[in-house]
């Protein structure tokens, strides 16, 4: 009795009337779909690729486990270059390492450089083959040298919309120079007609 009295009082205070019976509404009105949340997005090879590229500054292991196969191969900067690997230890082919390769590389890059602006200028795909390129700015944490480099990346995506092969390229001559001492120079002999270049 007291319960119904309180309900009646609350209804009168907020201006609600009794609910109409279901049969009082003509037609069939299905409930609307729930609003899209941050984890609700249409998965396509291109959108998966973009998600992985954009998680570089703050690697999300759970997201990467979801979007990268356990045996994915990551080719970073070069197939195999011991000199480059000595400067940037993540350079080389990481065969069948899976999401852990992404975590290790993305994290280590952040330890070596202070990341600046990163842009995806173009991205597109042909079924499971996707590619993108853009530019980024980075400042070496050891010497404080800032460089701007173009980058390009390619991925192969399976029918489950998971990346199983990933390749990243950049202007390594420029990015490696951010770790070069001003007191060190290297002589390059490239022109067949003679002459040298110093860097």
Swiss-Prot record:
Biotechnology (record note): Patulin was originally used as an antibiotic and specifically trialed to be used against the common cold, but it is no longer used for that purpose since it has been shown to induce immunological, neurological and gastrointestinal effects. Genotoxic effects of patulin with dose-dependent increase in DNA strand breaks in brain, liver and kidneys have been detected in mice. However, more recently, it has been proposed that patulin might also have anti-tumor properties.
Enzyme Commission (EC) number: 1.-.-.-
Result of knocking out the encoding gene: Completely abolishes the production of patulin, shows reduced sporulation, and leads to the production of a distinct dark-red pigment.
Metabolic or biological pathway: Mycotoxin biosynthesis; patulin biosynthesis
GO CC annotations on file: cytosol
Glycosylated position list: 129, 183
GO biological process: patulin biosynthetic process
Presence of the UniProt keyword Nucleotide-binding in the record: no
GO molecular function list: oxidoreductase activity; polyketide synthase activity
Top EC class of this enzyme: oxidoreductase
Superkingdom per UniProt: Eukaryota
Signal sequence bounds: 1-21
Record family assignment: Belongs to the patF family.
Cited function: Part of the gene cluster that mediates the biosynthesis of patulin, an acetate-derived tetraketide mycotoxin produced by several fungal species that shows antimicrobial properties against several bacteria. PatF catalyzes the conversion of phyllostine into neopatulin. The pathway begins with the synthesis of 6-methylsalicylic acid by the polyketide synthase (PKS) patK via condensation of acetate and malonate units. The 6-methylsalicylic acid decarboxylase patG then catalyzes the decarboxylation of 6-methylsalicylic acid to yield m-cresol (also known as 3-methylphenol).
Protein name per Swiss-Prot or TrEMBL: Patulin biosynthesis cluster protein F
Species the sequence originates in: Penicillium expansum (Blue mold rot fungus)
